[in-house]
Amino acid sequence: MKSIYTLVICSVFLSGVALAETITFDDLKTGGPPPGWTATQTGSGSAKWSVEKDGSAPSKPNVLKQSGQATFPVCIKNDTNLKDGFVEVKFKPVSGKEDQAGGVIWRVKDANNYYIARANALENNVVLYKTVNGKRSSLDIVGRKGGYGVKETVASGQWHTLRVEFAGNRFKLMFDGKQLFEVEDITFTEAGKIGVWTKADSVTLFDNFSYGSK
């Protein structure tokens, strides 16, 4: 049986090598949230995080699914504590009238304080934010003042890869293997947890959640 934890040696941003871990959810019981994760939300509503079987999963048979409705559903991996490193996930926006979004979060203090990078299939854009005391605000791209992330085709019903590499106050965002932009911010400087994120009524699938320290 395939282990949900796959250890690989991989190159990360800047220079050097880090030990990365990939979680596929494949050995977990379906129908409930993954053990060792905090399945919750930022704001009001009722998030629903569960491990489910899905025939389209990049790593079969299971995925992590968010099918509830809340301001910002988040699922946080409890045993992580990264200051500099990377986080990456494959995600598939399935449905949602208000939003069809998937994202990763890092330097998480709690469900109301973290950085978040997300891609949205309804808006066809990719944006990096900070969430402070439950309030989300977008961050300026290095070399550009103002604006709102970047326009990028995010096809609904298809799997995509979202990755953020972070070192100090600088964050590099990549989508489907292409670097889109970098951001600088000093709101959260200490190590924190990592996880995944959606918004509103987004039904989103996640698989191959990878991370490593620098």
Question: Positions of the model-derived regions?
Answer:
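Bacterial N-terminal signal peptides
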Residues: 7-16
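Secretory/extracellular carbohydrate-interaction modules
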Residues: 30, 66-136
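Extracellular glycan-recognition surfaces and repeat-rich motifs
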Residues: 32-63, 69-71
